[in-house]
Amino acid sequence: MKNISDCFVLNNGVKIPCVGYGTWRTPDGIDTVKAVREALDCGYRHIDTAQLYGNEESVGKGIRESGLNRSELFVTTKLKNTDQGYDSTLRAFEGSMKRLGLDYLDLYLIHWPVPAVFKDEWKQVSRDTWRAFERLYEEGLVRSIGLSNFLPHHIDNIEVSA
């Protein structure tokens, strides 16, 4: 990597900036709005957030205040564990989009593999969640989909129905 604008190419051809600005542990509020705006002013083009972080609204506001065109940015957010499952994933996505104030996402990730609330049903819940992700991708609401913090056996489970 030579500079902050260098990119990797994902399996589906979408380019993702090599360097991203993460917003974990940045609380919702004016400080996060400012931090995101300043990161974008410094040249960052990939902004990473998550439902679990509780700051999607401020991240979205920082993006809007930057004055950059949406097409210049790469925005990632992640699904919260307790929102896994087909219908709840679709609802959670709508909520994230509303909080972020965006029309589409560049990358949507399942944040963690095993929702503890589902215990023995985790395999089916994970597959249903992935099916909802595929729908969002097919509808053009998400440019790429993926997994975060998954172990091989979690991935194998999803591959069965992907």
Where are each of the predicted segments found?
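Active-site beta-loop-alpha junctions enriched in small/polar residues
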Residues: 24-26, 50-52, 78-82, 110-113, ...
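Glycine/proline-rich, positively charged
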Residues: 27, 89-162
